[in-house]
From Swiss-Prot:
InterPro entries: PsdUridine_synth_cat_dom_sf, PsdUridine_synth_TruD, PsdUridine_synth_TruD_CS, PsdUridine_synth_TruD_insert, TruD_catalytic, TruD_pseudoU_synthase. The active site is at D81. The keyword Isomerase applies. GO terms for biological process: tRNA pseudouridine synthesis. Coiled coil: none annotated. This is tRNA pseudouridine synthase D. The gene is truD. It holds the Pfam family TruD.
Length: 381
């Protein structure tokens, strides 16, 4: 497989929208929404921290240096962008809590501010978040492009958007996935096991993005062309599908088509299940109750069936399925953007956008869908 970045398809068909976005603390804000309420009792102090110009790992190092706490004792739910103003929750042993207020000025000098202090009975672990609220400010936006952006946001609010992995997964030089494959091929290896695992997961992410783009291509062909023309496309790709099945797919109201053999999952949390009745599942998808999922290949991954599997096979890798430490999983192909609010400030030529995404989804995917720039499958923020 060619590991260079290929263009990823968009969900919607508008022309490119021109504006400027700068990933900075002024124009990009991320606020973490915790998975559960904190009990205000327990052996772990839980602090809400606001940071700017720092990665989450850099922030943890500062806490370790100032408080004397070991980094391994600090808990966090996820990594937040460096080039943004972000808030997130951090846990640490209760005994360090008295040192927090004493070091307020030391934290502020490092672009950190503690917003709240609570307590809980367990340490915060990776994944212990519900999602994130985002704020983005677009600049150099004309009134016409603001109107176009509003129209795109209406479509996204109704149907959702592709759940692509963002550029954070692929690194500054867009080559993390290549390093991950080299690790699987025993061509290279790093001393830190977590780094090896992350790079392998980047390769999984690359395959997922490529599979999702292929599924979008198929969905667009089904929607745009006649049954006869679509049959010819499937024939050329050596994919088995009958004309009656294509007619049913064409009747699905959602722009992303559910195929025979898809693995569905209740949204936003829930069990996986097979798509047995496509008409029924397409309605549930339209109602944001269940979503088709894509493969993150690994030793214990759940695979699709029938037509969906025929397509998925092109994005599997035997080194992933045979790798003892790479268990594999599935990820929502699609995600629904919630609580979208926006305003256009004409005198400043600025467009302000706020929205919520569940954990694991990227604001850069929304930016990509709005801008519709023809480029590679990484976004420059």
């Amino acid at each position: 497989m060619n590991l260079n970045f290929m263009p990823l398809l968009h969900a919607y068909n508008h022309v490119s929208i021109d504006f400027h976005f700068n990933s900075s603390a002024r124009d990009f804000c991320v606020h973490e929404v915790p998975l559960y309420e904190f009990s205000n009792t327990g052996e772990h102090a839980v602090i809400q921290v606001r940071k700017s110009g720092l990665s989450t790992l850099e922030m943890l190092q500062i806490f370790s240096q100032i408080l004397g706490v070991k980094i391994a004792e600090l808990g966090y739910a996820g990594l937040k962008d460096k080039n943004a103003l972000t808030t997130q929750f951090i846990s640490l042993p209760k005994k360090y809590a008295p040192l927090l207020e004493k070091n307020t000025s030391n934290f502020q000098e490092r672009n950190l501010k503690i917003l709240s202090l609570n307590y809980h009975h367990n340490k915060i672990k990776l994944g212990h978040l519900k999602g994130n609220r985002f704020f983005m400010r677009f600049k150099k936006m004309t009134p016409l492009n603001a109107q176009k952006t509003e129209q795109v946001l209406e479509q996204i609010a109704q149907f959702g958007m592709p759940n692509y992995f963002g550029s954070q997964r692929f690194g500054k030089f867009n080559d993390n996935h290549k390093e991950g494959l080299k690790i699987l091929q025993n061509e290279t290896k790093f001393a830190h096991q977590k780094l090896n695992a992350f790079l392998i997961s980047s390769y999984q992410s690359y395959l997922f993005n490529s599979l999702l783009s292929k599924r979008l291509e198929i969905s667009k062909i089904i929607s745009a062309f006649s049954v006869k023309e679509s049959l010819e496309f499937f024939k050329q790709k050596n994919l088995s599908v009958h004309s009656n099945a294509l007619k049913a797919l064409k009747n699905q109201a959602h722009p992303f088509k559910i195929l025979e053999g898809d693995v569905m999952r209740h949204y936003p949390y829930g069990k996986f299940f097979d798509a047995l009745e496509l008409e029924k599942e397409s309605e549930r998808f339209l109602n944001k109750e269940a979503v088709p999922t894509g493969l993150l290949d690994g030793k214990k991954a759940l695979y699709a069936k029938n037509l969906s599997l025929e397509i998925e096979k092109g994005f599997q890798h035997n080194l992933l399925s045979g790798h003892a430490k790479t268990l594999g999983s599935r990820r929502f192909f699609w995600v629904f953007v919630e609580n979208i609010t926006s305003q256009y400030i004409k005198e400043k030529a600025q467009f302000e956008l706020e929205f919520y995404l569940p954990k694991g989804s990227y604001a850069s995917a929304l930016l990509k869908e709005i801008k519709h720039e023809k480029g590679e499958n990484n976004d420059e923020f």
